Amino acid sequence: MEPVIGKLNDVIWIVDLNRQSLDRVIPGVRANDWKNMFYANGWNVIDAKYGTQLETAFSSNNGDLLKTWIDEMPNQRYQYLLRLDQNNLRSEVPQGFKHSKELSNFLNDYSDTQLYKMFRNLGGHDFDKLRDAFNQSVKSSSPSVIFAYTFKGWNLPTLGLPRNHSTLLNPEQMEKLSQKLNIPKEDIWAKLPESSAAGKHCLQKGKIFSKTTKLNSKHIDQINIPTELSRPLPKFDISTQDYLQMILTEILRSNPELAERIVTTSPDVATSTSLAGWIANKNGLLWDDQEENNINNNMDLNQFHNEYDDPLQWTSSPKGKHIELGISENNLFMLLGQLGLSFERHNEILFPIGTIYDCFIRRGLDALFYGAYSNSQFIFVGTPSGITLSGEGGAHQSILSSSIGIELPGISMYEPCFAKELEWILLDSLNKIKLRTGST
């Protein structure tokens, strides 16, 4: 739960909550624990547990019995009832319930077909309930999470099967499903009729998402990225790690158009991965909370840094160019993946640079994979690397990074030995991001 997310009002997460794992029916679902976690972090929590049919039944006289029965029912029992047809469901309903007689009397007002449909009416499959949930989330001033309760295999003959994760429909079942969905047998890939409301909507959205975004020359022409820096190399021995900081500060000094669009991020290791100079040179942290910014920027904190000869003062503002994350490499690569698609999403070029201890790249591998898969354009620097951390033991050794860089498609991997080499690599990578022609 990164603190910065709690300040966003245009974030909607959907938790697809059903009673099955991949292998079995889950004995207990800790939904309330998950909801409380979001509550504690200031999120707007929306429950889409029951559909409108069930909620209408709950609100009628003695409808609370139906709700109590469903809420208290073990998952295994619930899954069993899902497999019953509408002719056999009613006789099984009251069993094991302390108010079975009263519940049976209540359900007598519903036909077998009505009871069958109502029992399956969960919020995650009820469009009216979902529309209401989305409307609530749009009006919220904080990020929202929707818990949508669903069935695995909805509207399929495999609904409720304990092992339906790897189950495929047979040809006969596929044919019945096609008939149910009015899909013509001679054209199984037929689109929705373009004259229908749904067809028009899909056509409009398809044009938006399939169009090729053109480079905005107004922004691009102003950014000149040289092949090397005009500043000479230092006359003393210097590590590539330290020279990274010099490259960034030189770009800040000599190329303000480029520096304006560079955004850096790190999972709580900015100082030890050589971003201190970049942050301290008037860039600061990106933070859009004026009250907290006033606290961060007060004189007492600055005096503390001065007293301990700390060049890095963590000033923050809505114009900051560094995003400081918690210790989560997965969050780092998720953020870089989104920043690296800023042009494709918003027609604005950004140059994202993330720094990370090289040995911990593997911790965020899944998010890195999807960033590269999405053709996101960003730079990440594994530093310190190699045997630099030998004193910290085997768990801090970069034994997989080279393999990841070589084997993962969509990634260009470099291992610079010299400071000048690092300069060439970094500038060339920035230019590829500008032209959208390179890899991650």
Regions found by a protein language model. Give the residues of each.
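Active-site metal-binding loops of divalent metal-dependent hydrolases
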Residues: 1, 17, 150, 269, ...
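Long, well-ordered, tryptophan-enriched scaffold segments
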Residues: 17-235
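Thiamine diphosphate
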Residues: 103-124, 128-132, 139, 193-440
